[in-house]
Amino acid sequence: MAQSKYEVTYIISTTLDEESKTALVNRFDGILKDNGAEVVDSKDWSKRRLAYEINNQHEGIYHIVNVLADNDEALNEFDRLAKIDGAILRHMIVKRED
């Protein structure tokens, strides 16, 4: 079965210090890897003003991860844990066609 390309974008709370943010990114990259996905690229996009307030915050750090996966197990686990983690304000997983 061919691997599918996915793009995972999530918004990190600006209340985290740099060390905590790095630990969070490494943790979620590890979740993807541990569940069978290959992380191609993981980088901060930018700190941006939010269109609307989320959890009393007006800004967030956008982080983008490009992933190759044979199935959706890793993405389902990422989705489940991102919903629980209060430091991730929002997240989105998109299957890429390119």
UniProtKB/Swiss-Prot annotation:
Name the Gene Ontology biological process terms. Answer: translation
Q: Which domain of life is it from?
A: Bacteria
Pfam families, per database record: Ribosomal_S6
Which SUPFAM superfamilies did the record assign?
Ribosomal protein S6
Q: Name one GO molecular function term.
A: small ribosomal subunit rRNA binding
Under InterPro entries, the record lists: Ribosomal_bS6, Ribosomal_bS6_sf, Ribosomal_S6_plastid/chlpt, Transl_elong_EF1B/ribsomal_bS6
Gene3D superfamilies recorded: 3.30.70.60
Record bears the keyword rRNA-binding: yes
The UniProt keywords, alphabetically, are: Ribonucleoprotein, Ribosomal protein, RNA-binding, rRNA-binding
Gene Ontology CC, one term: ribonucleoprotein complex
Q: Known HAMAP family for this protein?
A: Ribosomal_bS6
Q: Which family does it belong to?
A: Belongs to the bacterial ribosomal protein bS6 family.
The job of this chain, per UniProt, is described as:
Binds together with bS18 to 16S ribosomal RNA.
What's the protein here called?
Answer: Small ribosomal subunit protein bS6
What is the native source organism of this protein? Answer: Latilactobacillus sakei subsp. sakei (strain 23K) (Lactobacillus sakei subsp. sakei)
| Organism phylogeny | Bacteria, Bacillati, Bacillota, Bacilli, Lactobacillales
This chain is encoded by the gene named rpsF
